[in-house]
Structures are given as C-alpha cells and as structure tokens.
Amino acid sequence: MPRLLIAASGTGGHLFPALAVAESLPASWSVCWLGVPDRLETQLVPERYELTTVRAGGLQGRGLRKLVQLLQLLAATGRVRKLLRKQGIQTVFTTGGYIAAPAILAARWCGIPVVLHESNAIPGRVTRLLGRFCQVVAVGLSVAAKRIPGSKAVVTGTPVRSAFLSPQPLPHWVPCGDGPLLVVIGGSQGAVGLNRMVRGALPSLLEAGCRVVHLTGNNDPDVGELDHPNLVEQPFSHEMPGLLQHADLAISRAGAGSLSELAVCGTPTILVPFPQAADQHQEANAACAAALGAAVIVHQHAAEHRALGHALEQLMGARLRGNAAASNPLIPMKQGMMKLAVREADQLLVTLLKPLIGAGL
C-alpha cells in the first residue's frame, strides 16, 4: 500500500490545497498528516486522516531567539525522521510553511522524495532555502517558476476543495432582493483594517440596493456597528463555494488560496493586499490577477475608504442606478478570473506524486 505523508499546517492557505490533493489520491493510498499543535489542522484533519503534531517555528528572529528556533527545528526534524521510518512513508507532500522545514529535512535524511507546492507568486523562505532538497517544486502561479532555481519548478495551479468545482446553491441566509451581491472576505483571524475600510464604503451601496455578505473573521471588534437589512455579518461561512459562485463582486485579501477559489468561481474581485505579508507576496499575487483584468487592486492607506468607495462605484454604480445601456465592467473581470483558474490542479499534483511513491521504497 503506497504511504504518503502530507505536511501542511496553520492557515487555510496551506491546509485547504493539501486537503484537496488528499481527496484526489487513489483510494489505495494511505495518508498520514503532519501538523503543529493548536492550529487549524487539529480541527479539520483528525476526522479524516491520522494526525501527528510537532512544535515548529520560523527562523526570523535574532540572537538567542534564533538559536532556540534552530534547536526546535532540529528536535522536530528528529521526531519527523522517526515518524517516517515507523510509518514506512514513501513520499512526502508539503504546502510550505513552518512544518515544511522539518518534513523536508527529515525526508532528505531518510532518502525519501518530496513534492513541495508553493502557491504564492513570490516563493516563501522554506521554498527558497529547501526547495533544492525536493524532487519537484510545484507552483500555483507561473511567475513563481522564474524564482525557483534549477529546472524543478512545474506549474500546476493551486488546488481548491471539490465543492468549488461543482455548482452550489446560494445560502438561504443571504439578503433577498434583485440587487447585486457583494461578498467581503475579511480573513479567518479578522482583518480589522480591511473590515473598517469596507464599512466606510458600504452605506451608500446598501442604500442603493446592493446586498452585502461580510465575513469578518473572529477577532473584529466592530461587528454590529453597521446595521442594514441588506447586510449580513458573520465571522466565517462553511458555504463559501455557493457565496462566491453567486457573487457579482468580492472584496478580499490577496492570499494565494483565496485567489484560487475566486478564480475557479469566476468572481470579479477588488483585492486589498495585506500590507505586512512576508516579502509583500500578496502584492505580487494581486498583480497576477490584475494583469489578466480579473481584479482591481486597492491599497490600504490613510484614505482607504475613499479609494475603495471609488472602485465600488466604478464597478457597480451603473447597475445600481439601473442604467441598462452602460457597459458592465464586471463581465471582462469574470473572464479574466476564468483565465487565471486551474481547475485540475489537484489532479496535476497527484500525477507528480504517482511516479515518486515507489521511489521512496
């Protein structure tokens, strides 16, 4: 029986693509999962796959802190090596992040092949440092391939959960009416700056008949500040495929996972890159979508609500005013998103894994 270790941890951007690949594997394969304690995977993974957790962190600190992190990495690598041998793992698949480092190093130690998936336009630290130890580095965006040394990079796109790839109903709790639907994705941790920016731009849209679903995340202190019958605020939704498939427009950060979900749904989007993202990778992700005409970029700054309000007026104003003769700028944006989408990304990654699974014997 082929035995695969999936190392994916932390955020949905790392976890959901890995789960999509796991769902697409042949039924005969056995999957073990490597994660970090107290992260999202402890909620999503155990009901489907055997989960092992190890402490892992980055190497961004200095002095004593960096030394502690290095010792932690060495300890984690030793634990993963024991896991690989105990479970008879033949291949490792990882989506990057902190957990990828001990997984790649332990696999290298044991002579086990690794497929690393990098979803962002600018490769992360682990990809840059440890990609050389992997048999294949799969990338979600073609521009990232140019930043991968050697000839290991293969463009596969970033996998999305299967529900995004088939028609889904509009959730029943979405505000009723004929107005266009705007979906705001604030982020799982609550992007407070983005949420405040959105609330500053919404009142005129709501009064004009626009329906708005605002997914605020868990840590937004201003929930309930704006009250309107056309507005629904929720921390998150398990019905994202239905929301995005039926949305006329979305507002989102520019994480690679979110961008892939928006792309397969063909959802025109205003992207607001997270200003503190490592290496400004969200700026680069957003630029890829904007270059195809799929998205408009609005930056978070002192006059953010005015910039966002202007973009919303440009994209939705004519429809809200009932001007049927005006051209709809959302149509070419939808076409651009469809060009960005790679609907078979999960299958492409499985195809890369199949010839390697025997190489780890």
Swiss-Prot record:
Keywords: Cell cycle, Cell division, Cell inner membrane, Cell membrane, Cell shape, Cell wall biogenesis/degradation, Glycosyltransferase, Membrane, Peptidoglycan synthesis, Transferase
Entry keyword Iron-sulfur: no
SUPFAM superfamilies: UDP-Glycosyltransferase/glycogen phosphorylase (SSF53756)
Pathway: Cell wall biogenesis; peptidoglycan biosynthesis
UniProt GO MF annotations: UDP-N-acetyl-D-glucosamine:N-acetylmuramoyl-L-alanyl-D-glutamyl-meso-2,6-diaminopimelyl-D-alanyl-D-alanine-diphosphoundecaprenol 4-beta-N-acetylglucosaminlytransferase activity; undecaprenyldiphospho-muramoylpentapeptide beta-N-acetylglucosaminyltransferase activity
GO cellular component entries: plasma membrane
Protein's membrane topology: Peripheral membrane protein
Compartment(s): Cell inner membrane
Binding site for UDP-N-acetyl-alpha-D-glucosamine: T11, G12, G13, N120, R161, S188, Q282
E.C. numbers: 2.4.1.227
A Pfam family assignment: Glyco_tran_28_C
InterPro entries referenced in this protein's UniProt entry, alphabetically: GlcNAc_MurG, Glyco_trans_28_C, GlycoTrans_28_N
Record's catalysed reaction(s): di-trans,octa-cis-undecaprenyl diphospho-N-acetyl-alpha-D-muramoyl-L-alanyl-D-glutamyl-meso-2,6-diaminopimeloyl-D-alanyl-D-alanine + UDP-N-acetyl-alpha-D-glucosamine = di-trans,octa-cis-undecaprenyl diphospho-[N-acetyl-alpha-D-glucosaminyl-(1->4)]-N-acetyl-alpha-D-muramoyl-L-alanyl-D-glutamyl-meso-2,6-diaminopimeloyl-D-alanyl-D-alanine + UDP + H(+)
Family, as annotated: Belongs to the glycosyltransferase 28 family. MurG subfamily.
Known function: Cell wall formation. Catalyzes the transfer of a GlcNAc subunit on undecaprenyl-pyrophosphoryl-MurNAc-pentapeptide (lipid intermediate I) to form undecaprenyl-pyrophosphoryl-MurNAc-(pentapeptide)GlcNAc (lipid intermediate II).
Xref: NCBIfam families: murG
Protein name per the record: UDP-N-acetylglucosamine--N-acetylmuramyl-(pentapeptide) pyrophosphoryl-undecaprenol N-acetylglucosamine transferase
Source organism of this protein record: Prochlorococcus marinus (strain MIT 9303)
Top-level taxonomy: Bacteria, Bacillati, Cyanobacteriota, Cyanophyceae, Synechococcales
Gene name linked to the record: murG
